[in-house]
Amino acid sequence: MFKKRLPTKRVVIAGCRNYNNYEYAKIYIDLCLSNIRKENNIVVVSGCASGADAIGERYAKENGFKVEKYPADWNVYGKSAGPIRNKQMAEICDYVICFWDGKSKGTKSMIYYAKEYNKTIKIKMI
């Protein structure tokens, strides 16, 4: 008959631009999403940066998830573009998965805004 319509959950996958261990990240993302993907449509939210953001986009593609892109507008906002983008992503998402080296200011900003908006956040130190 009719297929049950699943709710949508938006998941930011972000982190350091120099992080490129897809196989390791995939295992961690699978673990983080194991419960919510059963009863929800997943949308991966991407900041369109290299590294962890690109890993998130690849993961979405391989798993048949939609991707919503939030590129930073460096030409308009200059150095503020990254934090502005991170705030936007934190506002609209349900979950955040970050791959962080403990130093990246951009990832720290994403974590900050996720906490400000009381989002469920998983941080994998790399």
Which residues does each PLM region occupy?
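Acidic/glycine-enriched connector segments
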Residues: 2-11, 18-126
